[in-house]
Amino acid sequence: MFTGSIVAIVTPMDEKGNVCRASLKKLIDYHVASGTSAIVSVGTTGESATLNHDEHADVVMMALDLADERIPVIAGTGANATAEAISLTQRFNDSGIVGCLTVTPYYNRPSQEGLYQHFKAIAEHTDLPQILYNVPSRTGCDLLPETVGRLAKVKNIIGIKEATGNLTRVNQIKELVSDDFVLLSGDDASALDFMQLGGHGVISVTANVAARDMAQMCKLAAEGHFAEARVINQRLMPLHNKLFVEPNPIPVKWACKELGLVATDTLRLPMTPITDSGRETVRAALKHAGLL
């Protein structure tokens, strides 16, 4: 369940900014039918930063209910205060989720020792599998391979989403962890190369709109059919890149609406609607991918 194409699913909202259950059901049904390995609910792409804690928990539980054991659900549970991250994680004990995706603390920029102690404390307060999440472009701090190696020895820490896009990280981390430590790319554009170097899959933004293609690409890569996987990847490459033409999840939420997967592309401030130029850029990438 922690391999292949795992979607960082958007959180669909109605025009008033309330979570839209009907659209979330449609999205989850789409991923079940498309072969997506698992869903990450309320991660970065799911707008964790603009949901309060009760809403955050409610959306994860809604996703679990709608998934109805057809597809595993992973909860985003990161925070920049350790006690807050522990509290959020503990909300999901015995809930039915299969694990947590826990981002590095943002804004306060802890040291490597601070990062180690943060993740260690979370893991010690739950039995849920923990996936570390390193995305320094958003958080302002970088979880270095040496620290990952230390954390890999902590009970319940089972893998990492590595979103630097730096492919040298794969081998650097692999040298410091056991073979069963899960390495997931957090960068769609380099995910196939990441897998060819020994990664196990991707937590994907692109999969929101190209679920079947991403699942097939990851399946081919896992079977060693990299030439065939690369054909799919090249068709998706403009989409991998252009879904970040404006801050995530603005473009991907609009793309979901354009494909009829959600009813609206409503976001909460400070996220604002996609611009006209952004819309045309993403539409062209969707056409190149054969999705329009």
Swiss-Prot record:
Its EC number is 4.3.3.7. It comes from the Bacteria. Signal peptide: none annotated. The gene is dapA. Homotetramer; dimer of dimers. Keywords: Amino-acid biosynthesis, Cytoplasm, Diaminopimelate biosynthesis, Lyase, Lysine biosynthesis, Schiff base. This is 4-hydroxy-tetrahydrodipicolinate synthase. InterPro entries: Aldolase_TIM (IPR013785), DapA (IPR005263), DapA-like (IPR002220), Schiff_base-form_aldolases_AS (IPR020625), Schiff_base-form_aldolases_CS (IPR020624). Pyruvate binds at T45, I203. Belongs to the DapA family. GO terms for cellular component: cytosol. Coiled coil: none annotated. The active site is at Y133 (proton donor/acceptor), K161 (schiff-base intermediate with substrate). It catalyses: L-aspartate 4-semialdehyde + pyruvate = (2S,4S)-4-hydroxy-2,3,4,5-tetrahydrodipicolinate + H2O + H(+). The record marks T44, Y107 as: Part of a proton relay during catalysis. GO terms for biological process: diaminopimelate biosynthetic process; lysine biosynthetic process via diaminopimelate. Catalyzes the condensation of (S)-aspartate-beta-semialdehyde [(S)-ASA] and pyruvate to 4-hydroxy-tetrahydrodipicolinate (HTPA). Its main location: cytoplasm. GO terms for molecular function: 4-hydroxy-tetrahydrodipicolinate synthase activity. Pathway: Amino-acid biosynthesis; L-lysine biosynthesis via DAP pathway; (S)-tetrahydrodipicolinate from L-aspartate: step 3/4. It is found in: Cytoplasm. PROSITE patterns: DHDPS_1, DHDPS_2.
